[in-house]
Amino acid sequence: MWGGNQSEGTRFRLFPQPGFLDSYAEPEVVMVSSPAGSVMEGPSDDRMYTIFPIGKPEPYGIAPNGEDVLAPPWRGDIEAPAQPDENGHFDYLEPGTPQFETAHLFGTVRFVLDIWEGYFGRRIPFHSEKTYDRVELTIQPTLENAYSGYGFLEMGGDRSTGSYKPFSLNFDVIAHEVGHSVIYSEVGVPDPENVTGEYFGFHESAADLVALISSLHFNSLVDLLLENTRGNLYMLNAVNRIAELSDNKQIRIAANDRRMSEFADGWVKEHHLSQPLTGAFFDILVDIFHEMLLDYGAISPEMEDLSDKLLATADYAPMMQEMFDEAYADHPEKFKLALLDARDILGTYLADTWERLNRQDLNFVDVGDVFLDVDQDHTGGRFASIIRGNFRLRDIGFVEVGPQLAPLGKDSHANSVRTLLPMD
């Protein structure tokens, strides 16, 4: 990864998916690029610091009186910070303590930044760097949400099932918020007075894609994913259960069938508006995966053609699953290599695309056009037909999104604490 020799990095233990899921009950040891000994208590480094405040009355943002703005740094009491071991690592910490939570939050943010700095080929600055030397990573149990804002990333938790599930232990939620930070830095913070609905949808889609691709950097998740699906990624599975909160509740499913025509009369929630774009990119990921399987000789051209013809028909599951079962049994190593290749191709293409986008009047057609340009630059257009076909299936470029039909709700992230900026 960009930024350091992994053999000399710092170890953390992270849950690839929420730890209350049976398949992911134990955290996995990962190595981040920060050299061992460079991450101090907190954890903290030269770019960010992690705290678990005691007695912090409200999350950052607009105060309940509607006048004051609560902003970092928090200057009150905090839980005892996590300490590195004698070799500079944090993987000795056990779940169930504030110190493990703060280490998990810091380790996840650093892990995701490593991944995306690898795709960008450079350091990704935080958009708050002109004001704050470091970003505050904060755990706020009274918050039933998670936000990446100006100078902070704040994690609450979920109480919808009756028991508290902290987002500081949820890799997908944290990675999603890091995704927002990446887009704020690379594309820009939306201007509420001059922004398109599709920009809001693009932002949510990009954050989901950051979480999706980042999760595929866990060997345990990739192995379990392939073992469960036998390589048939159109099955509903771990990789497209973004921000999963329980075994049967999924948010923003990437493998969706939503189209832009559903929003021709207008839109209300940017999360819904994001789904055609996220779905198009998930389908592109799967199609590139199939191309890589062909390159490795793991499937035949006839099998790929049949998969394309039967997709979205009642015959797909019974016929194609048997063929995938046989092919995966013969070539499990090639299936894994093909998936990792597809992951890195999509990650690199997205990074190159986001670098070139302009937030002004941004729409999904712009995203697709730039993505095609990136493919042309990298391969001479090898995947152009795949890209065009999947955008066409989502009506992107063929249907214009209607107006915003209602004010953004309390659950909206588009016009929220995330987009508050200091006055110049």
PLM region spans:
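Acidic/polar low-complexity interaction segments
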Residues: 1-110, 114-117, 126-130, 184
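Zinc-dependent metallohydrolase catalytic domains
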Residues: 99-102, 109, 113-152, 157-174, ...
